[in-house]
């Protein structure tokens, strides 16, 4: 017999009755019933109930065991009858009557319990992550992640993609976030950077003549944590294709994502059927107030600026006259809500930096509310018609200029739909956001700058760069969004040196700057580069959605905390002066802030 196990803890069934077996695992829980001791023994695969009979030498040894101790049990499989069966366990029809028990490793008192579903402080869980990962939900999340990655990889291979690995030690990149820098000992004063993405390498692979590349790529960015963004390190399904249009990229990625979500989505959930909707960026900002629209939310924002222009409602009339916008967020069914509902949303708006949240309630005899007192009846009716509302509905307003009012109206849209319970449940709704602007106006400097990826091909090519207002030029750039979460950015790349130099020139970067910063890729394009494009869906975010977790750290094996610290390994940590000297580095640490005198 094997020294540790003949079966795993999920394997035994009624047909094993009478067999002598050996199991190893962790003591998940113990229960004492009238002299008999029951142990739930857990391993990676499942749980089996162990019975320690009364009047045996094993009982005293088993009673001394702490939960989470590791043991090996040998005994006979017996069938459980009637109410003793546990339908919640695959092994619930049998148990093992122990006749030998060996302690492999005793556990000390736990910092928190593995059994149960209590919420413990995140920092405590991360400090003892190896214990946290024993909890059933966490174990399932990490196994789901592994299966999702396997599925993604297989689906890419089936579409003719080849997996390559790109360098981890590289040069600083233009992705936008701060780099993690690694001092080069053999080259004093110089640094490698950990890649923010394999962007330039995957494009160079296309220049090298490889046609379809992918990898599950680690990416490193020194940026702040969010619920859907892990600080420091994350993984993406990075891919690139030669001789493709934007639609070719969509045709490849849609079945990969739809297939993975169909494979791992809980039963009864709905997924976007057929081709994912394509929404131009301008339309997304107009209709949803976001470039990451959540299509589970049925509300569509409407522009009602003209209804307030030269109207009796002075505040909005003034905003309209000065070039601002008034946006209406429909609230179907909200007309029956008490006054407190509207006051609560008004207070919420103020807490979020707005002056308030105006509204109109529609009844059988017209509109009601503070705005209606100073707004002509025909204008109230016009707003109702534009928004497609009826008696018993309401509408909220956001007013201001440019992107600021667009984004705030999007936040209001989400808040109103949440409060009215309008967001579709148990569904994954995908869309592409396309036609991103190539450039934007930097509000601080007043100069034109790239709005997103500087290596995207401008729509219209060199002619557009030479003849159009830069702020009217769109790029062949796209995002894929699911339930309001951006899963991926991508683009058809700018592979023509003259177009690239002109694109950077418009953004204020001379040819010498481009040559210095991106000379490796630019030179490669001078030796014959195919048209190419790709994308890079975030693996962590995909798993977060499929696991229905609100925080991305719940689907990462050993994540950093919100402050970018590894509490378990105590990183980052100071290093010895001798190591700094070896690297020719000196520290210039910030001075501690003075404490107030008493």
Swiss-Prot record:
Residues binding L-aspartate, per UniProt: 175, 221, 452, 493
Broad enzyme group: ligase
Cellular localization per UniProt: Cytoplasm
Highest taxon of the lineage: Bacteria
Gene Ontology CC entries for this record: cytoplasm
Molecular function as annotated in GO: aspartate-tRNA ligase activity; aspartate-tRNA(Asn) ligase activity; ATP binding; nucleic acid binding
Keyword vocabulary terms for this entry: Aminoacyl-tRNA synthetase, ATP-binding, Cytoplasm, Ligase, Nucleotide-binding, Protein biosynthesis
Protein name: Aspartate--tRNA(Asp/Asn) ligase
Organism: Gluconobacter oxydans (strain 621H)
């Amino acid at each position: 017999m094997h020294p540790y196990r003949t079966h795993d803890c999920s394997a035994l069934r009624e047909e094993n009755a009478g067999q002598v077996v050996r199991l190893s695992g962790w003591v998940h829980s113990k229960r004492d019933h009238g002299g008999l001791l029951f142990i739930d023994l857990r391993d990676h695969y499942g749980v089996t109930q162990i019975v320690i009979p009364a009047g045996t030498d094993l009982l005293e040894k088993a009673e001394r065991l702490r939960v989470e101790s590791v043991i090996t049990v040998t005994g006979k499989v017996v069938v459980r009858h009637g109410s003793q069966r546990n339908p919640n366990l695959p092994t619930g029809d049998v148990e093992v009557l122990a006749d030998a028990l060996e302690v492999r490793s005793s556990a000390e008192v736990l910092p928190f319990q593995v059994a149960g579903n209590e919420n413990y402080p995140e920092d405590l869980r991360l400090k003892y992550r190896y214990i946290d990962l024993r909890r059933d939900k966490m174990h399932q999340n990490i196994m789901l992640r592994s299966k999702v990655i396997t599925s993604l990889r297989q689906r890419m291979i089936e579409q003719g993609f080849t997996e390559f690995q790109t360098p981890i030690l590289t040069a600083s990149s233009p992705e936008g976030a701060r780099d993690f820098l690694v001092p080069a000992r053999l080259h004093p004063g110089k640094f490698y950077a950990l890649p923010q993405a394999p962007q330039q390498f995957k494009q160079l692979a296309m220049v090298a003549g490889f046609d379809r590349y992918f990898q599950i790529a680690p990416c490193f960015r020194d940026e702040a944590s969010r619920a859907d963004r892990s600080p420091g390190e994350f993984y993406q399904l990075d891919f690139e294709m030669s001789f493709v249009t934007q639609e070719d990229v969509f045709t490849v990625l849609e079945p990969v994502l739809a297939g993975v979500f169909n494979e791992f989505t809980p039963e009864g959930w709905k997924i976007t059927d057929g081709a994912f909707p394509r929404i131009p960026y301008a339309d997304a900002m107009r209709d949803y107030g976001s470039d990451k629209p959540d299509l589970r939310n049925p509300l569509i924002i409407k522009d009602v600026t003209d209804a307030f222009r030269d109207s009796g409602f002075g505040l909005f009339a003034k905003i309209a006259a000065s070039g601002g916008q008034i946006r209406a967020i429909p609230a179907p069914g909200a007309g029956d809500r008490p006054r407190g509902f509207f006051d609560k949303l008004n207070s919420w708006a103020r807490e979020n930096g707005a002056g308030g949240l105006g509204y109109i309630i529609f009844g059988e005899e017209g509109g009601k509310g503070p705005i209606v007192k100073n707004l002509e009846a025909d204008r109230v009716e016009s707003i109702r018609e534009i928004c497609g509302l009826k008696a018993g509905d309401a509408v909220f307003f956001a007013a201001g200029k440019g992107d600021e009012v667009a984004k705030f109206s999007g936040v209001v849209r989400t808040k109103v739909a949440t409060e009215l319970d309008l967001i579709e449940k148990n569904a994954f709704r995908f869309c592409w956001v396309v036609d991103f602007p190539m450039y934007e106006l930097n509000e601080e400097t007043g100069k034109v700058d790239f709005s997103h990826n500087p290596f995207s091909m401008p729509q219209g090519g060199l002619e557009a760069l030479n003849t159009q207002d830069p702020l009217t030029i769109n790029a062949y750039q796209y995002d894929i969004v699911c339930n309001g979460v951006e899963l991926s950015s991508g683009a058809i790349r700018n592979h023509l040196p003259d177009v690239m130099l002109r694109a950077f020139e418009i953004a204020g970067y001379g040819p010498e700057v481009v040559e210095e910063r991106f000379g490796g890729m630019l030179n490669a394009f001078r030796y014959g580069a195919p048209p190419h494009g790709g994308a890079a869906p975030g693996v962590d975010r995909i798993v977060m959605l499929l696991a229905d977790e609100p925080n991305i750290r719940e689907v990462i094996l050993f994540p950093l905390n919100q402050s970018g610290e590894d509490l378990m390994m105590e990183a980052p940590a100071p290093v010895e002066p001798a190591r700094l000297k070896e690297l020719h580095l000196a520290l210039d640490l910030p001075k501690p802030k003075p404490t107030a005198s008493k």
